[in-house]
Amino acid sequence: MVIDGQQRLTTVSLLLLAMYNLMKKGIVVPAKASLGEQIYETYLVDKWQDDDTRIKLKPVKNDKEAFDRLFGDEADYIQESNLTSNYKFFYERIQKEEISVSELYDAICRLEIISITLNQDDNPQLIFESLNSTGVALSEGDKIRNFILMGLPSKEQTDYYEKYWNKIEQCTDNEVSLFVRDWLSVKQQVTPAISRIYYTFKQYVYDEKAETEDLLSDLLSYAKRYKVLLHGDRCNKNLNACIARLNRLETTVTRPFFLEVLRLYDDRKLTIDEVTTIFLTTETYLFRRSICDLPTNTLNKIFLTLHKDIVRLDGTEDDYVAKFKYVLLSKKERARFPSDNEFAEAFASRQIYQMNSKNKVYVLERLENYGTIEDKDIYSAC
């Protein structure tokens, strides 16, 4: 297991592979004819291994397939992969022959590598944090992944990565840091600063004495709900349309609350129609506040504690929709839900064209499509 330096190893491997493929095709010619085979057999493959294990570099699952295909026909490359993009950069740059392929290989051979082997009792996570503290910062999500998986035996690492972590990354569109921030908000009713997500997560795990698989299972459950908030995949057209509109308004402060609403749906405490009602009511609340020019800096706290405020009314999650509406309508002053009269008066005098772009287009789209059988695509024209 490599604790630190995976990106450097991957970059050098892509460079060497681009050099090898260019020499193999005769596009560039080295000073020594055997250089291509030397690179291939020394750095890229172990020819004594079976076909499925002979490639030396073993990236994570999604990247592994992309890297492996670079050894074959270009038609089979995974074009949307960052590995493929980086490989193609090297492939095209080498052909300019700003330096010869032989000179490039000599430069690679002068790279210095420090190898530190840990003892059985050493803590790889602490070593990693120490090494990474002065390097290029990893994302908070990367640190969390390493914190969860790094101390496990190799087989468990692989199993948990495949069963949980890879799926979490896919569900969150690889925005694990932001997802975990919302997950922590659900768990603690406090939103950590972006730079403190990892440390807040680590402290939470220590405080809760969470078992690794239980932790990953819970994260995956919430990640699946997070996917709904990103893309909408419930069988309700109105809900999906509402989610799309909220995302265009970039109302991310609602996500901790919506994650709990979707949990209640998964627990069969809410129907899909009730979930849709909650989302649409929230959309109305946000839109009315925007038209009435109420401050947005109160929204984070409102939605952070909204689920807890609802449950506090009678100590249960029963009759959730009615209690949700009651709590919102009970908000006062800067947190209030504007009445019909307040909204109508504000809308009549609001300078819509002076609103920020996302809110302005939202208003125009709603005026155009509300109550129609077939929606017109307003957003692509704006």
Feature locations, PLM:
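Glycine- and hydrophobic-rich flexible loops that cap the catalytic core of alpha/beta enzyme folds
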Residues: M1-S195, T296
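Generic low-polarity alpha-helical segments
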Residues: V2, V12, S100-E103, R110-L111, ...
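Histidine-centered nuclease catalytic patch
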Residues: G5, Y362-R366, T372-C382
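Short helix-capping/linker segments at secondary-structure and domain boundaries
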Residues: L22-G26, G135, R263-I272, N369-D375
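Short, Φ-rich (hydrophobic/aromatic) sequence segments
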Residues: L83-E97, L219-L229, L364-L367
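Generic recognition of flexible, low-complexity loop/linker segments
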Residues: S100-E103, I113-I114, C242-R248, D377-I378
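A cross-family structural signal marking well-folded subdomains
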Residues: E112, G141-V361
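Short low-polarity hydrophobic stretches
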Residues: N132, F258, T282, S380-A381
